């Protein structure tokens, strides 16, 4: 029998339903209001950013792509989405806007004026741009210092490790490792098997740098397989750079992430930091075993990093903690191997693509074989004109650091043509004038060095050699001025603007000696001489699936080429 519903129960149910509906409606309205507020805030921020960068910026009158002046996403597109090709756009922009100065991002200008290369040397008023040099997580390394005084203390403390006496002690290591890597190349190139040259050039430079810096090699020369782990990590390390440059806050997040996640996200950085940590701890442990923990660096006997392990009151240098030492170690390993290894590959390719140069170089090396094959005399080898010519011209054509290498404009600003670049957009209220203790430039303009790879590196379709390379090499060989190539002043300057201590790009363009302003440039120079002299004296080589297109490059702080150079050994003349 059905029971009629109670009227009061029905009324109560209706009231509850209406209350629930009202609450749901209010929640929906509040939610939409919050969304609208967030959206309005984002739109307002974008509008304010556009107004600031387009109408209020002191750089607003400098020519350049309008979108580049409005947002750094323009640079991000070429750096990350287009894989390090923004440096290719800069020469085109200078031509398009017919200007020696262009605006390439909201607070960043690019200058095509060789006279301004004076901003690069040590002691310059133009400090290194922190956003660029510190983005990979090595802010305390010698190549990344923003503070000029801190850099001077760091550099002067290490200088004894690069004295003439110390460097003379390193030469046998450089030569012996070069001989060893030649034997490895010979064993892996048996019966015409292609040799991936980058595996051996980078492994050689990695182990040399590790041995002279920390007293032991990494062991990279003996790694096998299609993807040797240390060489692969070096490639990955620089490939991270363009992303971290735009998102520097990754450094705050990684310490809180599981190691397995860090390995997946930043494999190159993780691997190189592990290697650096191992080398530093092994060096300290070895000194402990030998009872030398309190000893100073012994000039001509010790490893370079022993100069950094103890405070140096005379130099006002406080010894860094383990993290600081590891950052320096990573900078040494990456900067000392990637750059020189690339140059060794490129020289080999260019020489093998130019038979006349190869013939002249081989004749020169044959005539000098008594101080190459038997008892290697690095000083005699350094005087060989053809050998030094092919190295210098290759470095001019393919600098290992092709990017802008930005510097901050000093507080007083500078004038470039009709444009004034301020030292910062500061709030110049009371007590906030330049020179006052409280003065803080909020956003200093960044002045980017114009480092270009000249047009002569580009290959003509169907051409069997680099346009003008042989002619330019002959100009170096003859000892004349480098007038055969356009942009000579720019490219000469570009060979002295790399800041990593072992970089092979710091060899002077015009002189027979290296630039002593840069620590360890002679180490890189001797690595190049030893490796190439032994390679071309010992082996008859041919290129394998390699030509100038292998050297098509992108910029990830260092030069990254399209594909590694491969060679075949046709004959081992010493077998």
UniProtKB/Swiss-Prot annotation:
GO BP: secondary metabolite biosynthetic process
Phenotype reported upon loss of the gene: Abolishes the production of both oxepinamide F and oxepinamide E and leads to the accumulation of protuboxepin K.
Record key words, sorted: Glycoprotein, Heme, Iron, Membrane, Metal-binding, Monooxygenase, Oxidoreductase, Transmembrane, Transmembrane helix
Membrane topology: Single-pass membrane protein
Main location: membrane
Cellular component, GO, one term: membrane
Alphabetized InterPro entries for the sequence: Cyt_P450 (IPR001128), Cyt_P450_sf (IPR036396), Cytochrome_P450_monoxygenase (IPR050121)
Protein name: Cytochrome P450 monooxygenase opaB
Organism: Aspergillus ustus
